[in-house]
Amino acid sequence: MTERTINAERVEQLIDVFGSFDENIRKIEDAFGVRITNRNNELKVSGDEEAADKGCRAIEALLALAAKGEEIDEQKVRYLINLVNTGNEDQVSKIAKDVVCVTAKGRPVKAKTIGQQNYLKAIEKNTITIGVAPAGTGKTYLAVAEAVAAFRAKTVNRIILTRPAVEAGERLGFLPGDLQNKVDPYLRPLYDALFDMLGPETYGKYLERGNIEVAPLAYMRGRTLDDSFIILDEAQNTTREQMKMFLTRLGFGSKIVITGDITQIDLPGDKVSGLKEAIRVLDGVEDIQICRLTPADVVRHVLVQRIVAAYDKYEKSRLPDDHARKFTQKPQTKRNLK
């Protein structure tokens, strides 16, 4: 059993570190199997040597954040625990505090993980950014935040949000209602992000003026989009032809962000994902950056992170079996019918 001692500069810092009902400290205790006690400004961390060392590093990182006046919430503590487990806890203080934009309710939007920070930097630096990430990493929300920031700064005149309107085998023509009714369910996540950033009234005003356009991917064909911030969401469900068509819509003064999750492809088995192909074809092309986020960047409920990690592990273990099955299956022979 090892016991380590940490001294805080002020009691107020410990209040922030411990969190409401000591929930932050309990998370650290559970994660590393240690016991943490305090008296005045002094903290004691008890456990086996490696566990006590990790617990101390986590607390010291939280104290450093508290000293800077940083807000310490559940997501930040969970992310810090992941960083400590990989020996990268120093990175938590390197997450840029730059605000991308402010929502309609006055909430600042900024990176919460190193992966998100690199993603935002890629968008700001490059004309085309491809964000490949699992669910819950904020890839679409942050892209919309960058689009709103660019529009407010008058570096673009329009925000165009699009996604494939055909998913899970459904065709628009078979769905009830007019065109708007047909596409609304597919585009709802994009509407939600814009409503959050702008508020419904401002969104409606810009939509009426043509400053904002939310449309199915098919509506991009034959157009050249100048001075626009264009986001293609759910890009894993584009075909290779759709992806090439979309990329060639780029006009002068425009910026493109493509987001998708290659583990959630809904295309028929004989169709190649345009996103997967674009990643291979465009890797290394100047002014195009491919940015990959991981389960560590998931900022939703902690269970979402576990679900994403579990599916990721399952998919990796399944690949060798699928590959072997492909070459061991006997080809089917056609019977001659008379």
Report each predicted region and the residues it spans.
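Short amphipathic alpha-helix segments
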Residues: Q13-D30
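Conserved loop-to-helix interface motifs that mediate assembly, gating, or partner/ligand docking
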Residues: T86-R107, A111-I114
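Conserved helicase motor core of SF1/SF2 NTP-dependent helicases
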Residues: E42, A104-Q116, A122-L232, Q236-K338
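Interdomain "pre-motor" coupling segment immediately N-terminal to P-loop NTPase/helicase cores
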Residues: T37-A96
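Short, surface-exposed acidic/glycine-rich loop or hinge patches that mediate macromolecular interfaces
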Residues: V11, D22, E49-E50, N237, ...
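Short glycine-/aliphatic-rich beta-strand segments at the starts of folded cytosolic domains
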Residues: M1-D16
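Hydrophobic side chains in well-ordered alpha-helices
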Residues: V17, N24, G55-A58, M243
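Compact, well-ordered interaction domains used in eukaryotic information-processing assemblies
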Residues: R26, F32-R35, N41
